[in-house]
Amino acid sequence: MRVLLKKLKQSGFKLYGLTNWSDTIYRVMEKFDIFRLLDGMVISCEEHFIKPEKEIYLRLCDKYGLKPSECLFTDDRMVNVLGAKATGMEAVLFTTTKKYIFEIERIFGIKIEQ
């Protein structure tokens, strides 16, 4: 997944995190450099909303000047995917990297070298 995120970043995609974690996320972020790939993040403990509540997805958009219709949300839980879709975001359920790459290629009409 890290390799894929790096490729997306190098291709000009902006990457944002949206998590239901508590403030312990900051200790995790210090340990794993994958978080440095993100252009921003919304953490539920700071926003007082959690996925799949509509407000947290919209907070991400408001905070970073994004339009829901121009966002692709990815999660490994269908309930969160449906929450994102309810805001107008395109959303994909993550099951495997291979399937995820297929979905990105389909949605954006691009080819990602594997």
Sequence positions of predicted segments:
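Short low-complexity stretches enriched in small and charged residues
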Residues: 1, 25-28
